[in-house]
UniProtKB/Swiss-Prot annotation:
It comes from the Bacteria. Belongs to the amino acid-polyamine-organocation (APC) superfamily. Amino acid transporter (AAT) (TC 2.A.3.1) family. The chain crosses the membrane at residues 30-50, 51-71, 102-122, 137-157, 162-182, 211-231, 256-276, 283-303, 350-370, 371-391, 413-433, 441-461. Residues 123-136, 183-210, 277-282, 434-440 are periplasmic. It catalyses: D-alanine(in) + H(+)(in) = D-alanine(out) + H(+)(out); D-serine(out) + H(+)(out) = D-serine(in) + H(+)(in); glycine(in) + H(+)(in) = glycine(out) + H(+)(out); beta-alanine(in) + H(+)(in) = beta-alanine(out) + H(+)(out). One of its GO terms (molecular function) is D-alanine transmembrane transporter activity. It comes from Escherichia coli (strain K12). Beta-alanine uptake is inhibited by carbonyl cyanide m-chlorophenylhydrazone (CCCP), which dissipates the proton motive force. Induction: In complex media, expression is negatively regulated by Hfq and the small non-translated RNA GcvB. Hfq is required for the GcvB effect. InterPro entries: AA-permease/SLC12A_dom, Amino_acid_permease_CS. Disulfide bonds: none annotated. This is D-serine/D-alanine/glycine transporter. GO terms for biological process: beta-alanine transport; D-alanine transmembrane transport; D-serine transmembrane transport; glycine transport; L-alanine transport. Permease that is involved in the transport across the cytoplasmic membrane of D-alanine, D-serine, glycine and beta-alanine. Also contributes to L-alanine uptake. In addition, in minimal media, transports the broad spectrum antibiotic D-cycloserine into the cell. Transports D-cycloserine only in minimal media, and not in a complex medium, suggesting that CycA does not play a role in D-cycloserine transport when E.coli is grown in a complex or biologically relevant medium, probably due to competition from other CycA substrates present in the medium.
Length: 470
């Protein structure tokens, strides 16, 4: 299944046959960082802080720890065969064509749903400056812009993600530095609140809402990490993947400590967790509370670009998944055609049209944070399915191809054990989703996607995949 599309570095290669390795190490490192700093951190952390209090720091650390091992499994598998274009390829190769079909289409749907959440977030951030702006205007403008830029070249996507990620990095580092200065100077907000690390343990302790509050923080916190596997969809367009992919994956723990743990510690030191408004981004509200409205506008711009960055990643990855699925015969043939610039243009256009569903979602559920919660729950469940498929593929790889593991230059630590630990953790998170009313609704809707996929495989996909193999 993995040798049907040639992947080349030569910019002069025939566009109809090949993707091009035009993403450099600089692009891959920043794409990985940008993927780890998702909309969920900016948009969802207000709700998670209000649900869990300071214990949300441990929630992010636990999820990050688990996903690091998922990414290590993905990295070893992708590097075991450089013909793999993405994780749907090794799922198809190791688990069977059905797995490639389910993984590819589910990952496509994951990013469409995530893109809808980004559209919702962009609308909310735009209303910070333009409260009377129609929802659909901001959404449509962003979608058209992303489509136009992605139709250019894969290098354009890499450049956009590079600068989007740089904006996020500078903003979060600045927030941490400013917050530390406020704490050191015992800064007082207009409401009389003094910045202090003591807010982390003085207002009810580390677990003010008990274990129930701690567990409740996992759902939106999981969504903050979606996109962490994005480097796995760039494998076919990366120069020197043997060096770039390990470097990007190995930096995950540092990124989590810097961008999640430190940022949340500073936010809750300047603004007591009990004062955080669930419906608003604490990154914006932090500066509003300390009387710096101009800085709040800057941060609002940053979180808006973060949402645009996430949507940009979604547009890229969905088009590449559709391209691979079409090559395997389980998606319309039109998606397998590349433009003169080696870009899957029809897949890009189709995915962007689907993003307009975010606008529809706002009409169905006028509450922005309510719509965001419902969308993110569906997305989190589907991403956990994809991560589980990666782990299952790794277990089969270890059993059926031990010789490849032995000579691997990038072995997953504690491979088999951590696969089972991570899968048990995902089951635990799904159980937690049944405890809250808003997340339970989305959990009940999600199986409809798998039923639709199953019917598609039974009546169409299975036959087409068999014909292509012959």
């Amino acid at each position: 299944m993995v040798d049907q599309v040639k992947v080349v570095a030569d910019d002069q290669a025939p566009a109809e046959q090949s993707l091009r390795r035009n993403l450099t190490n600089r692009h891959i490192q920043l794409i990985a960082i940008g993927g780890a700093i998702g909309t969920g951190l900016f948009m969802g952390s207000g709700k998670t802080i209000s649900l869990a209090g300071p214990s949300i720091i441990f929630v992010y650390m636990i999820i990050g720890f688990m996903l690091f091992f998922v990414m290590r499994a993905m990295g070893e598998l992708l590097l075991s065969n450089l013909e793999y274009k993405s994780f749907s390829d090794f799922a198809s190769d190791l688990l069977g064509p059905w797995a490639g079909y389910f993984t590819g289409w589910t990952y496509w749907f994951c990013w469409v749903v995530t893109g809808m959440a980004d559209v919702v977030a962009i609308t909310a951030y735009a209303q910070f400056w333009f409260p009377d702006l129609s929802d659909w205007v901001a959404s449509l403008a962003v979608i058209v812009l992303l489509l136009t830029l992605n139709l250019a070249t894969v290098k354009m996507f890499g450049e956009m993600e590079f600068w989007f990620a740089m904006i996020k990095i500078v903003a979060i580092v600045s927030l941490i530095v400013v917050g530390l200065v406020m704490v050191a100077m015992h800064f007082q907000s207009p409401t009389g609140v003094e910045a202090s690390f003591a807010h982390l343990w003085n207002d009810g302790g580390w677990f003010p809402k008990g274990l129930s509050g701690f567990f409740a923080g996992f759902q939106i916190a999981v969504f903050a990490f979606v996109g962490i596997e994005l480097v796995g969809t760039t494998a076919a367009e990366t120069k020197d993947p043997e060096k770039s992919l390990p470097r990007a994956i190995n930096s995950i723990p540092i990124r989590i400590i810097m961008f999640y743990v430190f940022a949340l510690i500073v936010i809750m030191s300047v603004t007591p967790w009990s004062s955080v408004v669930p419906e608003k981004s604490p990154f914006v509200e932090l500066f509003v509370l300390v009387g710096l409205p101009a800085a709040a506008s800057v941060i609002n711009f940053v979180v808006l670009t973060s949402a645009a960055s996430s949507a940009n990643s979604g547009v890229f990855s969905t088009s590449r998944m559709l391209f691979g699925l079409a090559q395997e015969g389980v998606a319309p043939k039109a998606f397998a055609k590349l433009s003169k610039r080696a870009v899957p243009a029809k897949g890009l256009t189709f995915s962007c049209i689907c993003l307009l569903g975010g606008v529809v979602m706002l009409y169905v559920n006028p509450s922005v944070i309510g719509a965001f919660t419902m969308i993110t729950t569906v997305s989190a469940i589907l991403f956990m399915f994809v991560w589980t498929i990666i782990l299952c593929s790794y277990l089969v790889y270890r059993k059926q191809r031990p010789h490849l593991h032995e000579k691997s230059i990038y072995k997953m630590p504690l491979g088999k054990l951590m696969c089972w630990v991570c899968m048990a953790f995902f089951v635990f998170v799904v159980v937690l989703l049944t405890l809250e009313d808003d997340t339970r609704q989305a959990l009940l809707v999600t199986p409809l996607w798998f039923i639709a996929l199953g019917l598609g495989w039974l009546f169409i996909g299975k036959k087409r995949a068999a014909e292509l193999r012959k």
